[in-house]
Amino acid sequence: MGTRGPSAPVDTTPAKTIVVYRNGDPFYVGKKFVLSRRRAATFEALLEQLTEQVDVPFGVRRLFTPTRGHRVLGLDALQAGGKYVAAGRERFKELDYIHIVPRKPAKIRKLKEIKPVVHCDINVPSKWQTYHRISRHINVFTNGRLFIPPAKIIIPKFSLSDWDIVLATIGEKVFPLGGVRKLFTMNGHLLGDSKDLQDNHFYVAVGLETFKYFPYWKSPRVPSEVQQRYANVEKNSQRKKKVDSKGKEPCKYDGIPPKTQDSVYYAKEEKKKTLAEPLVQRGAEGDVYKAPTPSKETQGALDVKEEHNVQLEVPVDQRQAEIVKEDEEIHENTPDFEGNKDKEDARLCEDVERKMAREWKPVD
């Protein structure tokens, strides 16, 4: 029988357990690592193992003690149950790593369902629960087009939160001028939000033009109940208009609109106010402008009469109007050059005819 060779020595060194933190992270809870000679035979192998488990920028390149930040240089310096900080190329950052405690996740608060009052017989869910959870079924007319039947549109529940998306959804089936910009009820009330939409109601989609008041409810697609309701509203409005028109008094200025009467540029009839006092007649007794005695310089002076040969220069606007001859009279006096030319041409033609007649005259 053969003999066995000497067996290899078995390493009986117990494995070490350490806790590793991340450098500069106050929320990172330390991880436990078991150091065995088989997996981490060298310090470089240990750093590679830590790089796989601890997320450090550019990998784990250094180990420090958590309290004073002393650098660990080998496996022999590691103590069983010790705590260390893994870092990359950066410097050690002082934090209280030992007392980092894992935080419990915050509890999600459940919304309590609003229940109706006990003494109330109505058992209806609250509006805030059902508003954005139920889609809307509406019927939409095109503005000003009575002969086009209303389009049935289903607005999804997820689009009710945005009014622009609601209008875009309506614009996929209704095509007014310029696209759907506004939404009105059949009697002309503007809708500003999806909260005003009601199931199975009728609306009018309007684009760039204004809303046109047409009897949309007379369409055969509209239920008879809705038609009767809108017809009653129209009758009541017409009665009110007749009563208001009878009760009004006729206006003074029928031909002039009221805006022009109140305008600054509108001339109003007013009597002239005489602010100046009447002039005092000259020559009356006690007149301040009348000299009490005639002056000596003017006594014996003769009045000089104007001569007829003297010419006075009068301004243009004060001169008498002169009669200007019209162009027709001037044209009559001018010689008729065209007529004379025609006469000369006629004479030349006669002379030529005479010469031709003489040349072709037969000889006896």
UniProtKB/Swiss-Prot annotation:
Origin superkingdom: Eukaryota
Chain segments carrying region Disordered: 233-255
Annotated PROSITE patterns: DC
The keyword Translocase is assigned to this record: no
GO CC, one annotated term: cytoplasm
Tissues where this protein is expressed: Expressed in testis and spermatozoa (at protein level).
SMART domains, per database record: DCX
Keywords associated with the record: Cell projection, Cilium, Cytoplasm, Flagellum, Repeat
All residue ranges annotated as the Doublecortin domain in the record: 16-98, 136-217
Cell compartments where the protein resides: Cell projection, Cilium, Flagellum; Cytoplasm
GO biological process per UniProt: intracellular signal transduction
Pfam families attached to this UniProt entry: DCX (PF03607)
Protein's name according to its UniProt entry: Doublecortin domain-containing protein 2C
Organism (species): Homo sapiens
Gene from which the chain derives: DCDC2C
